[in-house]
Amino acid sequence: MAADPKDTTVTDENTETAATAEVETVASAPTSPAQKLSAEALIKAFETEQMKSDLPEIYVGDTVRVGVRISEGNKERVQPYEGVVISKRHGGMNQTITVRRIFQGIGVERVFMLHSPQVANIKVERRGKVRRAKLFYLRERVGKATRVKQRFDR
């Protein structure tokens, strides 16, 4: 008897086990809220994997040099940006620092995500001695008044 093209019965043992495995995976799909938390755990695990481990301890008031990756055409270079850390925000993967510097007499502030691929490296040039968590008052100061005392114990 010739094989009928409309015949859909399959007697291969491997395909039978594959079909039963598909049925089992469909049955074990997450339906309860407890199993949906595993997705959050998966995201958190991915974020911790992406975090940089070679970052120095950065405090508000420190003078830092941030190496910023800049791509011009098909070339990529690292441009240093040096200034005083005036604020730190968030934590973990989304941690940011705001760095302020004076360029040609004008105050320039940039916010850097510490774990971003655009940040090539960070080096602490000097430690600052401050008594505030945010140094926004430096925005109104001019000249020597913007200097932060140096801290030697860290």
Swiss-Prot record:
GO CC terms, sorted: cytosolic large ribosomal subunit
PROSITE patterns, A to Z: RIBOSOMAL_L19
Pfam families for this protein: Ribosomal_L19
Disulfide bonds: none
BP-aspect Gene Ontology terms: translation
Segments of skewed composition (Low complexity): 16-27
Domain of life of the native organism: Bacteria
Start and end residues of each stretch annotated as Disordered: 1-33
SUPFAM superfamilies with a match to the protein in the record: Translation proteins SH3-like domain
Alphabetized GO MF terms: structural constituent of ribosome
UniProt keyword annotation of Repressor present: no
Keywords (A to Z) from UniProt: Ribonucleoprotein, Ribosomal protein
NCBIfam families in the record: rplS_bact (TIGR01024)
Function: This protein is located at the 30S-50S ribosomal subunit interface and may play a role in the structure and function of the aminoacyl-tRNA binding site.
Family under the similarity heading: Belongs to the bacterial ribosomal protein bL19 family.
Name of the protein this chain belongs to: Large ribosomal subunit protein bL19
Species in which this protein is naturally found: Parasynechococcus marenigrum (strain WH8102)
Gene: rplS
